């Protein structure tokens, strides 16, 4: 048995399983925290992964709905739940994912009340040589956000990718990626713009790079990022670099974070590639 992927939504998992059944491939679903899709005949793994990539690009394609009707599995025995918004967040996010989200929200609220400068004095990258031993500053810059759009954008991606990493690989792995990427992306960004910056985007880009390359090199890990999303991330970096949107972006942090994530994924998958 080989685990192909995992879906947070059991309906989506069933749609893919039903479609593959019409293609002559039998998959099974095991319900744990998420819906894990397993393949019994491992010789069909490459074919299934290719179909999965197409499915993820457009899971709402009518052919997948038609396959569900054709397979006759609407009474498959899966007990679907209607997740309210908060329950959906909780289903995908582990404790570290939640802790960072709460920290960012609390810092944002305090910044809104007392002003950004008052908070940056305590949390920003060391802006004076006398502060270089205040070690929290090398990481807490990631908790500061300067607009509602800024924090919503970063926390959405953090929840989506960071939550998946924590659920599949554990809290320890998410902590390591977060700490290393916050440190190195912050270091690069302060070389570009000085110490007055903030945001979780360097960590988010690290998670994007990690999830994409980990999925490409080690699909059995259950971690992946669709190629369309990594392409979007690269386009966003280019747009920020050339100031296409006229917004201030932490371009150094984005590039450094992405590089950190790719490097960590490569290191983590070396042994997996050797096994295959």
Curated annotation (Swiss-Prot):
Alphabetically ordered keywords of this record: Cell inner membrane, Cell membrane, Hydrolase, Membrane, Protease, Serine protease, Transmembrane, Transmembrane helix
Protein's cellular compartments: Cell inner membrane
Catalytic-site annotation from UniProt: 201 (nucleophile), 254
Catalytic reactions on record: Cleaves type-1 transmembrane domains using a catalytic dyad composed of serine and histidine that are contributed by different transmembrane domains
GO molecular-function term, one example from the UniProt record: serine-type endopeptidase activity
Any Pfam family: Rhomboid
UniProt membrane topology term: Multi-pass membrane protein
Enzyme category, top tier: hydrolase
Source superkingdom: Bacteria
Main location as per UniProt: membrane
EC number: 3.4.21.105
Keyword Transmembrane (UniProt): yes
Segments crossing the lipid bilayer: 96-116, 142-162, 169-189, 192-212, 229-249, 250-270
Biological role stated in the UniProt entry: Rhomboid-type serine protease that catalyzes intramembrane proteolysis.
NCBIfam families for this protein: PRK10907.1, rhombo_GlpG
Protein known as: Rhomboid protease GlpG
Organism: Citrobacter koseri (strain ATCC BAA-895 / CDC 4225-83 / SGSC4696)
Recorded name of the encoding gene: glpG
């Amino acid at each position: 048995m080989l685990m192909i992927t995992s879906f947070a939504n059991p309906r989506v998992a069933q749609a893919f399983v039903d479609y593959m059944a019409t293609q002559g491939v039998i998959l099974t679903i095991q319900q744990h925290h998420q819906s894990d899709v397993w393949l019994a005949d491992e010789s069909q793994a490459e074919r299934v992964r290719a179909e999965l990539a197409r499915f993820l690009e457009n899971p709402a394609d009518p052919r997948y709905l038609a396959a569900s009707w054709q397979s006759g599995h609407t009474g498959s025995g899966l007990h679907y739940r209607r997740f309210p918004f908060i329950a959906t967040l909780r289903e995908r996010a582990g404790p570290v994912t939640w802790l960072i989200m709460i920290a960012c929200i609390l810092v944002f609220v305090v910044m809104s009340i007392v002003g950004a400068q008052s908070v940056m004095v305590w949390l920003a990258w060391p802006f004076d040589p006398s502060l270089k031993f205040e070690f929290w500053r090398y990481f807490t810059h990631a908790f500061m956000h300067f607009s509602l759009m800024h924090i919503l954008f970063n926390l959405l991606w953090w929840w989506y990718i960071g939550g998946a990493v924590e659920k599949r690989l554990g809290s320890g792995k998410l902590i390591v990626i977060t700490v290393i990427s916050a440190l190195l992306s912050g270091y690069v960004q302060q070389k570009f713009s000085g110490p007055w910056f903030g945001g979780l985007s360097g960590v988010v880009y690290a998670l994007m790079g990690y999830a994409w390359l980990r999925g490409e090199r080690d699909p059995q890990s259950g971690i992946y990022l669709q190629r369309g999303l990594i392409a979007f991330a690269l386009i966003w970096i280019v747009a920020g670099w050339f100031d296409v949107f006229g917004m201030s972006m932490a371009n150094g942090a984005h590039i450094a974070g992405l590089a950190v994530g790719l490097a960590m994924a490569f290191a983590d998958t070396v042994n997996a590639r050797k096994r295959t």
